[in-house]
Amino acid sequence: MKIGVVYPQTELGGDPEAVRAIGLAVESLGYDHLLAYDHVLGATHDREPKLTGPYTELHPFHDLFVMFAYLAGITQRIEFTTGVLILPQRQTALVAKQAADLDLLSHERLRLGIGLGWNYVEYDALGEDFKTRGARADEQIGLLRRLWAEPVVTFDGKFDHIDRAGILPRPKRSIPIWVGGMSEAAFRRSGRFADGHILMGTVDGAQQAWARIEQYLAEAGRTSVGFGRELPIGGQKTPLEMAETIAQWRDAGGTHASIVTMGKELRTAQAHIDYIAEVRHHLDREVQGRAS
């Protein structure tokens, strides 16, 4: 199983030195990937309709493509995972271009997790329709893959229109697209279009969600073999409890796990690094125990 770390976007005040330190630590400690959450704008919640999501204008978020491009230049091995990029609030052709360049410049280290988001204020500010975001995402996934593969694309969809145009340079592969979310619509979207799914919550809840995704894969005539399953794992866990939960997810069939250090009252980048270092210690001991 691939094990990574979620970058603690909301807790380090947008500190560039924290980005560098944590990115380098994730690689040096032997983790497989760095996952990061996405928001373009934070918004005050006191409005109508009410906003009920977990973030406000007080929570910092680095731009994922910019942050990962920076980290690609100072690391050699770790994968970069958008977990998730709010795709429907963005222009499809621009995402195709940004993702292609990041994948090329990082030597094929991008995994593009996509989702719909919950903040209609972001959509309004970016000029996209919040109400049609699900249908738009379905259309965007196929168009992204065409833009990465074809020199010239003609596309006349409900949301995007391209007349004999393409991006260059194109990536050397079809960048993996994973869907994130715990709604029935997200499970269906994964079954029809995705290379993997980013789940949420507990191991038991993720297993139940996976059963639904398997049904949608079968309905689409697709196999679950090679289909990825990632669970970001948070909560008030000690490093040992975190390692034990990762092992539970592995034993349940998970292919990827990510350590969430946010919400643990870790006040500095070094405190976050110390936590993931201790988790790594317990993970290595568990592997040694299974091998003996």
Where are the regions a protein language model picked out?
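Active-site-adjacent structural elements that line small-molecule/cofactor binding pockets in enzymes
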Residues: 1-292
